[in-house]
Amino acid sequence: MTSAPASTALVPVSKARTGVLLLNLGTPDSPAPGDVRRYLRQFLSDPRVLDIGGLGRWMLLNLIILPTRPKKSGEAYAKIWDATRGSPLLYHSQDLATGVRAALGDVPVALGMRYGRPSLDSALDELERAHCTRVIVLPLYPQYASSSTGSSLEELFRILGKRWNVPAIDVVPPFYDAPPFERALAAVGAPVHAEFRPDHVLMSFHGLPERQIRKSDPSGAHCLAQASCCDRISDANANCYRAQSYHTARVLAGNLGLGATDYTVCFQSRLGRTPWIEPHTDKVLVDLAKAGKKRLLVFCPAFVADCLETLEEIAMRARADFMAAGGEDLRLVPSLNAAAPWVDAVVELLRPRL
């Protein structure tokens, strides 16, 4: 009597897994001009960031920006650089990944940057080594912009397109109107608001060229066509960064108990001479000081991690400008960084997709 043949069924050596990719913009490796130049070249060579013709972009970058800006930007980065941990945007993002990893248990969590390090390639390698055949991608930009979310996803798919083993991808959409994000903003900001007791609140979002806002409007007739274009989300402005920013501001104001005259929405960090969305933060805060406002509290709800735009542009330069114009104090509300309410919110955004 012969024995039954052994089973030839394949036994997996490891269980297929779902992983998480947290995706942020990036940062130079150091404030040194060479590192800043390398970062700016990569960032500003992106046609979704400088959305002008290729020749014009090359000339603007190589003849105007790169010869002078790396030194100036490097000096600004040096003011916020931590001697031990380096770039605030990087270490806050790393801390967030650590917190999310701890909360999710055995779910692999990787951090990747659109520009600089850790690269998207290295993050995907990390998830592949963890045997992830499905990846949930969370772009850490609350409001959609082609120059941030769009660019990051385009680069992610470009990299994936060169790989032999491509995981299933599930992208979390912009979360500007997600209750977990809205609650986290209020949880982090409300204690600062109560302690500082401002006489006015600024909600300062990163700016964009007006042309990029118009490009996001499929109707071609809504965005920036009238003053009320961002009063509510509609089909025409569903992908409009400015409309999404105003939505975030309205909800945050409501959660803080602010009336319509207690806060102002504005946009910072404009570059070049082309029209950028208004009102501009640097002009608004001076006007408020001249109008008699003395204590100004600033939220930056487009940035989930503190960075050059919050720590240097607002907490240092904007504060100096406000006080020079007659104000007494300006306080920056910290970004969400890796605060417990934000870690909880990220987990809440991810959990239904796991």
Where are the predicted features?
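Active-site-proximal alpha-helix that buttresses catalytic centers in soluble enzyme cores
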Residues: T2-L354
